[in-house]
UniProtKB/Swiss-Prot annotation:
PANTHER family named among the record's database cross-references: UPF0111 PROTEIN HI_1603
Protein's name in the database: UPF0111 protein TC_0063
Organism from which the protein derives: Chlamydia muridarum (strain MoPn / Nigg)
Domain of life: Bacteria
Disulfide bonds, paired cysteine numbers: none
Family: Belongs to the UPF0111 family.
Cross-referenced Pfam families: PhoU_div
InterPro entries for this protein: DUF47, PhoU-like_sf, Put_Phosphate_transp_reg
Length: 224
């Protein structure tokens, strides 16, 4: 709590940025996780899954501390509701990442050649959608310096639109993946089918929440 208080003293957005770094750290593990699945390195899968869970727990702790500080009346230049919505949505991204990590440890899952390539495209776009909105969060101090206007605000709007476009691309790739999984010509073990559909759903949750987060950041500009 004392550490967080010092962050609030440095900048009203520093705690939010500290939280987004932990969420980002959990998202960054997804590529190595799925690469380990591809290589059949299940010990590495277990180790990386534990790392994701550790980052998610740390993010939860920061989230709860931020909520406590907001309740105590600390000054912030945006509405408390906006701040709470942003932190909650960020945390939902970390939750999705942890869910994926847990699902990957349920059994020794494998890729099927019919969807491996498109899956990694889907994964790349999903991770990218969060990376873009995380960039907007990291630059909120600069927004404050510009009084939420000018070129800095326009740059943030561009990032918000980029996230929306990426989320749409994720939707299209998700649809293609589901078509493959449900195709009558595609053969897959029942347990694998259940796990892959759940994994795809959780990955979609990351891009959906990234879009929600970007929208909320964009709304802070309109509220000024």
């Amino acid at each position: 709590m004392q550490v967080l208080a010092s962050l609030f003293g440095r900048s009203p957005f520093s705690p939010l940025q500290a939280h987004v770094e932990l969420v980002s750290a959990s998202i960054e593990v997804l590529f190595p996780l799925f690469s380990a699945i591809k290589e059949g390195d299940y010990q590495r899968v277990e180790a990386l899954a534990q790392l994701v869970s550790s980052k998610e727990r740390q993010a939860d702790g920061v989230k709860n501390d931020i909520r406590s500080h907001l309740a105590s009346g600390v000054f912030i230049p945006v509405s408390r509701l906006a701040m709470l919505e942003i932190i909650s949505t960020q945390d939902s991204v970390a939750d999705c990442a942890e869910d994926i990590a847990i699902l990957l440890t349920v059994k020794e899952l494998r890729f099927y050649p019919e969807f491996e390539e498109i899956f990694f495209q889907f994964l790349q776009k999903t991770v990218q959608s969060f990376e873009v909105v995380a960039k907007a969060i990291r630059e909120m101090d600069l927004l404050l310096e510009s009084s939420f206007g000018g070129c800095r605000a326009e740059k943030t709007r561009v990032l918000v639109n980029e996230v929306s476009n990426l989320e749409h691309e994720c939707d299209l790739l998700q649809r293609e993946l589901m078509k493959i999984l449900f195709s009558e010509n595609f053969s897959i073990e029942t347990k694998d089918f259940v796990l892959w559909t759940q994994i795809i759903k959780r990955l979609s949750g990351i891009s959906n929440n990234s879009e929600k987060l970007a929208y909320r950041v964009g709304m802070t500009l309109e509220e000024k």
